[in-house]
Each structure stands twice: as C-alpha cells, then as structure tokens.
Amino acid sequence: MATHFARGILTEGHLISVRLPSQCHQEARNIPPHRQSRFLASRGLLAELMFMLYGIGELPEIVTLPKGKPVFSDKNLPSFSISYAGNMVGVALTTEGECGLDMELQRATRGFHSPHAPDNHTFSSNESLWISKQNDPNEARAQLITLRRSVLKLTGDVLNDDPRDLQLLPIAGRLKCAHVNHVEALCDAEDVLVWSVAVTPTIEKLSVWELDGKHGWKSLPDIHSRANNPTSRMMRFAQLSTVKAFSPN
C-alpha cells in the first residue's frame, strides 16, 4: 500500500493543468473569485498526480459528501485529501483505505491571523504536558493541530471538536479515534511548512513530491530519510490498539 503527498506553490500559472475537464472550470466559475485560483490549483495538482501515477489523462469526476469531503465518484479510484496553507497547495493520495491531509505555515502558527492558530485551540492536559517539554512549543502546538485535523479530514468530520471522538497521546505516539479501527498519522515540521498525513489502515510507504508547472515533478526526501535525519521533527502516531514500532529499513 502506497501513500503520496504532493504539494506546489500557488504562483500564477505554475499549477495550471491541461488535464482539468470543462466541468471543473465551470465549477470554479460558481465559487467566489478569491477562491477560484486555489480551487483550480488543487484540482490541477491532483490531476497531474493521477497522471504521473496511473496515466489517467483527465481528472476523474469528483463529488462532495454530505459533510463536505470531496471524493472521486468512481469508488475504484484512490482516496485523496486536499489542504491549503498560505500560497501552498497540497494533495494526499492513498492506494488503499482513506486519507486526510492538513498543512500550516510555520509563521502562521505564530500569528493571530491564522484560523487554526495555537491560541485558538484548547489542548488536553496530556498534550499540554508534551508541548511544555518541547524545544519549540509553538511548533509543537502546530504539529498537534495539523495532526488532529488530518485525522478528522480522513473521517470526513473536520468540524468535530469532541475530545471523546479523537484523543492524541503524543508522549506515547498514540491516538484514539472513535470512528475508525485502524489509523496511522505522520506529521513533520519543516522550516516553512508543518504537515500531517493520516491513513487507514496503515502507512507502509509515504512518498513526498513537489510540482512546479514549469519544471515538473521533484521527489523530496521520503519518510525513512526524514526519520534518519538527526534534526528530524517527524512524529508517527498509531491507533492505540494497533501500535507498532517504526523501523526505518
């Protein structure tokens, strides 16, 4: 089972894809102008990822579930998740199960203008204890926020703030999610971007990509390379009942 995380910078023209169907452009015209460019960029990124991985020349039809989660109408196609952070667009895709992606810019987590800023989030006593022991508490808060939202986006219930439905135990590297039996999440804090990918039932392999419309795809360090980096801030969380060790082989 493979999982892919692709991202690109929302610069004019750089994420425009020729693989978008006319229906997608029509849908974009029906949303507010300030959201049109990022809508087309995210669909373009997904379309290019589907072409790279499967040779599918045009983005398949997407429908929206009742709680707002977009999915391919063809249930035989992979699960995907879309996220935005500043001028960056991200897409996660998994070949089996479901996935969720969330991203935050490092500087946004330190400012009042971010809708998911740490000051707007209530942490549990367990989470607060872990945060207090980290070298960069702001970054630690951002990691927990993105990790939580990636799991909620996986379940399709992103607005659910009930702690009984999702508990994070960062000291143990575990989580408890009431809606799925098996889930794993990976969260990394880079110099600019904090991101988290959650997958059911497990993350066996995660490839990281970057797309520039002018220069094409670029492969970024995968999770094993990141885990072996002495300065790595990567965290891996597994469902409480199915915890397994992370072996960078």
UniProtKB/Swiss-Prot annotation:
Top-level taxon: Bacteria
GO CC annotations, alphabetized: cytosol
InterPro entries: 4-PPantetheinyl_Trfase_dom_sf (IPR037143), P-Pant_transferase_sf (IPR050559)
A Gene Ontology BP annotation from the UniProt entry: lysine biosynthetic process via aminoadipic acid
Molecular functions per Gene Ontology: holo-[acyl-carrier-protein] synthase activity; magnesium ion binding
PANTHER family in alphabetical order: CYTOPLASMIC PROTEIN (PTHR12215:SF22), PHOSPHOPANTETHEINE TRANSFERASE (PTHR12215)
Protein name, as recorded: Uncharacterized protein YieE
